[in-house]
Structure formats: C-alpha cells, structure tokens
Amino acid sequence: GVYAQGYLNSWNLGAEASTADEVYFFNQIRDKLETYSFFDASKVYGIGVSNGSALVNKLAIESSYFSAIAALASQLIVGTTPSGSTAPVAVYQMCGMADNIIPYDGGMSVVGHHFLSASNSALSWVNAFNCATEPIVEMLGEDEILIYTDCESGKEIRFHSVNNAGHNLNQPNTPNFYGPVWEFLKRF
C-alpha cells in the first residue's frame, strides 16, 4: 500500500494551510505505481479518515484512480460532489452520529469547511450513479448501514452511521468496522 501524508499535515481542500496540488501529487504517485509489473490499476482503493476522507472523496470525483473508496469520519464538502460524469466508484461512507468536528447533520465545521449532511452526502453518490433509491438496511451492533445497489456502473454505495461515536469512530462499544470495510473494498 501507499500511505501518503499531506503537506503541513493536511490535504489542500481549500481551507487548510497547504496550497499543494493534491490531484497532481496523486497523478505522480499513480504514474510511478504503473511502472511496476505487479500493479493492478483495476484494483486501486482509496481509504481516508477525516481530512484524508475528504481528499479521497475529492480524488474519486475529479479522477478515475479508484475502483472503490472508504470515506471515514467525513462526508462531502459543499461544492465538491459527484455528477453523472464522475467515473464509477464504489463508496463506503462511515460517519459518527455524535461527531463534533464534522457535523453529521451537515453545516459549517470547526475545520473551516461547509459539509453536506451525512445522508445527503451518501445520496449524492447514489444519485450520481443512478442507484436504487430504496436501500437494503443492515445492522452492525447498534450501527445502521444503508446499502444502495443496482447502480448503473455495477458499483454500490454504503452509508454506515456509527451510533454514539464522535470524530473518533473507534469507540469502546463500537464493533470492529475495519473488517467489513475491507470486505467491501475488495469486492470491487
């Protein structure tokens, strides 16, 4: 795996101290990876937490790097949303329902971005890929996972609301979610 670190400990999404061109940076990484014979460009996954999650969303919208992403502890920033021209990508979005950094119900955050609500963020992906609008509902402990299938692209959108979790999703009473996230990603 590649574990990149943002300039000045953040990714440039507009409100951060960094002025780095993140799409260019990831183009450089991808170009290098493609020189290796073992690299499978059809199985590239993006996983991000918090600011990294917002970056993974941005890269999924502005490029065709990923076959699937996991956006953890953040949702879409207002003005950075997928459209019908966004390359197909499977999305696992996980948000803490008591997040005091990235508001679950959307709005201005303490990090200087205006976020969509968690549900509208997931529905933006659903609408962009023309998925079935009636989700399958699964429970993981006390957490609800809405699964949107039948997307035109053959992808899937999962919206996982972590009950009683703040910005740190890994709470003592929270089930282990890394296993389900990885199982989701490797299907695409």
Predicted feature locations:
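Acidic catalytic loop of the alpha/beta-hydrolase fold
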Residues: 99-102, 167-169
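Alpha/beta-hydrolase-fold catalytic nucleophile elbow
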Residues: 5, 47, 70-73, 92-95, ...
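Serine-hydrolase catalytic machinery in alpha/beta-hydrolase-like enzymes
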Residues: 1-45, 49, 54-58, 174-175
